[in-house]
């Protein structure tokens, strides 16, 4: 990317009020693997970002599902909602028995108790972001929490 700091997946740029981690282009997301310690399976194509970026209130993951693949079991959460944002591709989510078609630009919010699974029923990879946060934790949304800061942006040349 133009102007980006040269970072690899093992390092992040940190400042007083930010952390920036570069996972690389979405076409490389398949290299990531989730191997939960208490589950006898692994998930290829999933990278959790919370610890990498130092987030205190949100878990987020990058995900890619190859054609013909999907989540092999239903799951739900005890207290966290999830929002899935499809970045590229097409697929389906099964939510409480209802099949929902998704495609690039789809955003799907699921309450904690929703039994869910997903699959890629297309011929191209399905890329999505998953944002997980405690249900009812956002008190003010939109711009209500924002505050204007004096001055103008001073971009480096």
Regions found by a protein language model. Give the residues of each.
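A short, N-terminal "cap"/entry segment at the start of jelly-roll beta-barrel domains
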Residues: 1-58, 139-157
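Conserved short histidine dyad/triad with adjacent acidic residue
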Residues: 42-48, 61-77
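Short, charged/polar surface micro-motifs in flexible loops or helix N-caps
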Residues: 54-58, 66-70, 90, 134-137
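Well-ordered beta-strand scaffold positions
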Residues: 58, 63, 98-100
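Conserved hydrophobic/aromatic positions in well-ordered beta-strands
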Residues: 61-63, 84, 129
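Glycine- and acidic-residue-biased ligand/ion/polar-headgroup-sensing regions
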Residues: 79-81, 85-91, 96
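Ligand-binding loop in jelly-roll beta-barrel domains
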Residues: 92, 112-138
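Short acidic-glycine-tyrosine-enriched beta hairpin
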Residues: 97-112
């Amino acid at each position: 990317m133009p102007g980006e700091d040269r970072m690899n997946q093992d390092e992040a740029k940190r400042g007083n009020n930010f952390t920036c981690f570069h996972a690389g282009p979405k076409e490389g997301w398949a290299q990531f693997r989730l191997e939960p310690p208490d589950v006898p399976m692994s998930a290829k194509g999933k990278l959790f970002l919370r610890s990498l970026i130092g987030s205190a209130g949100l878990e987020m993951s990058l995900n890619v599902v190859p054609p013909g693949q999907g989540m092999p079991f239903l799951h739900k959460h005890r207290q966290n909602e999830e929002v899935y944002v499809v970045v590229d591709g097409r697929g389906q989510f099964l939510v409480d028995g209802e099949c929902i078609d998704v495609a690039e630009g789809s955003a799907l919010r699921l309450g904690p108790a929703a039994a869910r699974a997903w699959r890629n029923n297309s011929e191209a990879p399905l890329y999505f972001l998953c944002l997980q946060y405690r249900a009812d934790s956002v008190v003010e949304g939109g711009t209500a929490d924002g505050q204007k800061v004096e001055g103008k942006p001073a971009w480096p040349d």
